[in-house]
């Protein structure tokens, strides 16, 4: 038994040495990486509308384009509440398809939350549900904030992501 282990030991050492010396692929980078870019909303559809306690409650479908670290198309369904004082709160889920930073290409689900007014909102989105992701070669996790105009549909985003 000792002879078998000793015969394999040099090969194991050589493989470990190569793993340390050779750089890994870009998608295997450890730690958070910066994310930034722009969003353009190209379509907004009101799926349903109701009222409760002076609030207007909307279910909306939003589609658009992302450019930058995350590059491609997105579609999301949001629950938006317009409060009597004019402020807006929003929560929803969506799917981003295209380039997902250095993690690869494919589709990844995300959740979104935002608040603001009828003219401008700020919020955050986060890629979730890795089992539903089709990104290759690796999956993605992120925490990204955004701000922009609901009038023009133009937003900017910044944050971090890492490949899992």
Model-inferred region functions:
Residues 2-13:
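Bacterial N-terminal signal peptides that target proteins for export
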